């Protein structure tokens, strides 16, 4: 049985009480949720359900919106790819934020342009991760100072993304060239070897990274067998000869 969507192991009791009561629709809880987002960024925890609840409050109370909190939620959601959390958060934002500035029929209102640009840049990162274009993800992340500003509040962002990339890779391969994996993880040298051995628990032999066998990367044929009882088969034959009423 899978983990419920609204489950978060590190969620504080007072946040859980709000989410399971009518107060989740109370604008006065906005500050509490915003502080919780900050806590997630600092302590490397994550609570998608609470973050979406805050974005929903922003929908109903636009005057309470805090741009920095929105971008922090989006950045945190990148650390749990390939889950759909980024897209879920994106669809709770105002449409004008999602429209490219160059394609807008009119100039954005004061304060909208910076958030719109930030959201669209983060959407580019999400697309690269979702399409497994990991090398391009790291080069894009290093290409603009705005990216550095956006991820600054999220503690351990790069490490968390690398762990997710490694997890995804482990589901599809048994061996991969070290040089290729260095590009995918955006690191090299001693830092790369330390990450591979200590964090991933993999080994390196003659320039090749060996990924341990698991149920996802095991090349194993699947045989599907269905048992049909004779009485079931006879009913099918009988119906074929029955005259329509």
UniProtKB/Swiss-Prot annotation:
Span of domain PCI: 46-227
Record bears the keyword Nucleus: no
Listed GO biological process terms: formation of cytoplasmic translation initiation complex; regulation of translational initiation
Keyword Ion transport: no
Record GO terms (molecular function): ribosome binding; RNA binding; translation initiation factor activity
Record InterPro entries: ARM-type_fold, CSN8_PSD8_EIF3K, eIF3k, PCI_dom, Transl_init_fac_sub12_N_euk, WH-like_DNA-bd_sf, WH_DNA-bd_sf
Subcellular location: Cytoplasm
UniProt keyword terms in alphabetical order: Cytoplasm, Initiation factor, Protein biosynthesis
Main location: cytoplasm
GO cellular component, one term: eukaryotic 43S preinitiation complex
Quaternary state and interactors: Component of the eukaryotic translation initiation factor 3 (eIF-3) complex.
Protein family (similarity comment): Belongs to the eIF-3 subunit K family.
PANTHER family named in the record: EUKARYOTIC TRANSLATION INITIATION FACTOR 3 SUBUNIT 11, EUKARYOTIC TRANSLATION INITIATION FACTOR 3 SUBUNIT K
Reported function: Component of the eukaryotic translation initiation factor 3 (eIF-3) complex, which is involved in protein synthesis of a specialized repertoire of mRNAs and, together with other initiation factors, stimulates binding of mRNA and methionyl-tRNAi to the 40S ribosome. The eIF-3 complex specifically targets and initiates translation of a subset of mRNAs involved in cell proliferation.
Protein name in UniProt: Eukaryotic translation initiation factor 3 subunit K
């Amino acid at each position: 049985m899978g983990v419920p969507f609204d489950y978060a192991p590190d969620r504080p009791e007072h946040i859980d009480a709000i989410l399971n009561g009518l107060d989740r629709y109370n604008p006065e809880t906005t500050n509490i949720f915003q502080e919780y987002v900050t806590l997630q960024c600092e302590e490397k925890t994550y609570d998608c359900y609470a973050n979406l609840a805050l974005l929903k409050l922003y929908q109903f109370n636009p005057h309470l919106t805090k741009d920095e909190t929105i971008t922090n939620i989006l950045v945190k959601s990148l650390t749990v790819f390939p889950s759909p959390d980024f897209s879920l958060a994106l669809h709770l934002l105002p449409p004008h934020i999602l429209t490219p500035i160059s394609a807008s029929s009119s100039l954005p209102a004061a304060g909208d342009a910076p958030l719109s640009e930030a959201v669209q840049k983060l959407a580019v990162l999400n697309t690269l991760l979702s399409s497994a274009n990991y090398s391009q993800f790291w080069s894009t992340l290093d290409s603009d100072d705005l990216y550095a500003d956006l991820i600054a509040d999220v503690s351990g962002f790069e490490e968390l993304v690398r762990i997710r990339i490694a997890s995804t890779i482990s589901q599809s391969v048994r061996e991969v060239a070290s040089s290729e994996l260095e590009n995918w993880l955006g690191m090299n040298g001693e830092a790369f070897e330390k990450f591979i051995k200590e964090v991933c628990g993999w080994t390196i032999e003659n320039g090749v990274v060996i990924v341990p066998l698991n149920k996802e990367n095991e090349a194993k044929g699947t045989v599907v067998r269905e048992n049909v009882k004779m009485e079931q088969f006879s009913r099918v034959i009988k119906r074929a000869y029955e005259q329509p009423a």
